[in-house]
């Protein structure tokens, strides 16, 4: 139906794939990658890497941390993974769903980490990838500074809570202002 296809969090996006997964056992080392178009594209361009490692991609293009949080139970908790890799924030900064508020975005990321831990799911947090601007939202100002500030908070939270942190930003940035 129209409502299902256009639901804010797109909860049904992976419903068939989720239903087709066998029930996870304690021996399983199921890993879920939760993200946006970056994650979705990675799965699409490297399906063998995901399949051969037992990795499950749950990226939806254009989504923000608000939408990730709404679908976290469906696409992560209910699948009983051993580990979830959370990559969130790019589309928040791009204001894809609302005016950017770093505290809200950071809070959504923390909430996902807390939900995972409460369900005995290990967490890896990642940085937001570098961007100088967003071609679909050129009016957004100070993009590099906003990304760096959010990344600093995610990294500090990860360190304080002994959560592994993968710094994609550091590996990919060409210039701090780009």
What are these regions (language model features)?
Residues 2-82:
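Serine-esterase "nucleophile elbow" of acetyl-processing enzymes
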Residues 85-89, 106-113, 117-126:
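Conserved, well-ordered alpha-helix/loop/beta-strand core segments that scaffold catalytic motifs
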Residues 129-178:
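Catalytic His-Asp segment of secreted/periplasmic serine-dependent ester chemistry enzymes
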Residues 57-60, 90-103, 137-143:
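Surface-exposed cleft-lining segments at the edges of enzyme active sites
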Residues 101-110, 144-150:
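Charged helix-capping and loop-helix junction motifs
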Residues 34-36, 86, 166:
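Active-site flanking residues adjacent to catalytic metal/cofactor-binding acidic residues
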Residues 37-41, 61-65, 90-94, 129-134, ...:
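Solvent-exposed loop/turn segments at secondary-structure junctions
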């Amino acid at each position: 139906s129209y409502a299902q296809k256009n639901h804010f969090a797109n909860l049904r996006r992976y419903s068939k794939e989720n239903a087709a997964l066998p029930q996870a056992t304690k021996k399983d080392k199921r890993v879920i990658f939760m993200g946006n178009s970056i994650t979705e594209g990675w799965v699409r361009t490297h399906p063998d890497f995901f399949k051969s490692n037992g990795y499950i991609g749950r990226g939806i293009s254009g989504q923000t941390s608000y939408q990730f949080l709404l679908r976290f139970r469906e696409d992560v908790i209910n699948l009983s993974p051993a580990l979830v890799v959370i990559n969130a924030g790019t589309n928040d900064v791009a204001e894809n769903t609302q005016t950017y508020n770093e505290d809200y975005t950071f809070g959504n990321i923390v909430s996902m980490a807390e939900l995972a831990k409460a369900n005995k799911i290990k967490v890896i947090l990642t940085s937001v990838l570098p961007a100088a601007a967003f071609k679909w939202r050129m009016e957004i100002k100070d993009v590099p500074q906003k990304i760096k500030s959010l990344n600093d908070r995610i990294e500090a939270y990860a360190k304080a809570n002994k959560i592994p942190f993968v710094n994609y930003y550091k590996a990919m940035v060409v210039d701090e202002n780009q």
